[in-house]
């Protein structure tokens, strides 16, 4: 009892200030709940990572086909390169097109077969010796279980024999010195 009280007192002393602060935070949220939530949602919408994550739908296994964003233009919400702008009336514009460095996925997607359809060849163990086949028709000798208790009252000696064919049953065989007794049943 004394050990448990020594354990409970420090735990309560450490957790009570946090519980009090939690209640104060709940009261502040209820006062200006709508203003803070609107502000937080608007702030999250303008984060560039948020733009990039929501810009591309998930293509499953074909994510590598998406175009890459230029490393020096990390805040652009679209993944294409900007064409260079040359100032001056007689400047010659380059005649090449901006293309992404990775091609977009094709319209027809190849189906991915399930792993159960893949044929795996069996391993060849040439260095191991061949295991001889076991003859299941071979005769099995019965195991003799000795009697554990001595028999009193001059009854015949009984040995229990266990065979694999009758694994849960014990066959009882009598010794040759047994006597036969006739049993009559009363007629009802």
From Swiss-Prot:
It is found in: Secreted. The modification Phosphothreonine is found at residue 163. Keywords: Glycoprotein, Milk protein, Phosphoprotein, Secreted, Signal. The record marks 117-118 as: Cleavage. Residues 1-21 form the signal peptide. InterPro entries: Casein_kappa. GO terms for biological process: lactation; protein stabilization. Glycans are attached at residues 143, 148, 167, 184. GO terms for cellular component: extracellular space. Belongs to the kappa-casein family. This is Kappa-casein. It comes from Sus scrofa.
């Amino acid at each position: 009892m004394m050990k448990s009280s020594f354990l409970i007192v420090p735990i309560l002393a450490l957790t009570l200030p946090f519980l009090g602060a939690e209640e104060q935070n709940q009261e502040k949220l209820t006062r200006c709940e709508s203003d803070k939530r609107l502000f937080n949602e608007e702030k999250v919408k303008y984060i560039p990572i948020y733009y990039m994550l929501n810009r591309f739908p998930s293509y499953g296994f074909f994510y590598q086909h998406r175009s890459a964003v230029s490393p020096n233009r990390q805040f652009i919400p679209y993944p294409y390169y900007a064409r260079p702008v040359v100032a001056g009336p007689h400047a010659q514009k380059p005649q090449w097109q901006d293309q992404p460095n990775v091609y977009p996925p094709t319209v027809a997607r190849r189906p991915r077969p399930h792993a159960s359809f893949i044929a795996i060849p069996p391993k060849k163990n040439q260095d191991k010796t061949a295991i001889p086949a076991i003859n299941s028709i071979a005769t099995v000798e019965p195991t003799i279980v000795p009697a554990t208790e001595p028999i009193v009252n001059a009854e015949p000696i009984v040995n229990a024999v266990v065979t694999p064919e009758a694994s849960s049953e014990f066959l009882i065989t009598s010794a040759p010195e047994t006597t036969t007794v006739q049993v009559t049943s009363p007629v009802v």
